[in-house]
């Protein structure tokens, strides 16, 4: 994990900082593996603690690398941007020294939907995101097949970059079993919005999530959402979505998801959705970040 590319990048950054001499350097990633020096303030962005919390998805070596280098990074960090209160809380649990560093929860800034789409229901569930186990794609496939076995009629469309061979095999096998499953691979920004506008509901069965931007995107289309009951989803949606329990064994998780697919609430609270979207609007969050950076 001492990638030559990573160290070369930060060596280049250090040279540029020596030339530019900024007041603040904002690193959009979590770890800065070298001491950048200089008289400027350094701000890092912390997305999650997954390499420590979910070693099974990242491996023991990367988990140790992450923990060691973040501890070193924090010694030279003046400000932290978090993406959620959950991430802040978890970070401070693993790294108590982070509590004494100035911080704000505001960095998630998404682009507004500019094109107008005609909302309709073409009778399909949709998942868009990375195709990996951490995102719960395996649960989605198994839950959907059970949903169909129990009389469900809607189709399932999957979109996103394939990240793991195990998930690839699960998806391919499921498509051979059920012709109502479609995998589109990576989808463009416009295609994604087109799919949002025509779906019955968005399904987001993630097992670990630092934020969940797709949920905010879907709320703009006023469509039902079915997600796992991760605490982060309660934080960002104020509990205004359908959820299924994943705090159980896999057999129960699959049953719970199938139950939700069969009986989810098709009505949405449009006012509650609008309030969530407004909270994460670019203008508002941009001002929060600006005020934080310029407050000292």
What are these regions (language model features)?
Residues 1-296:
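Carbohydrate transferase catalytic cores enriched for Leloir-type hexosyltransferases
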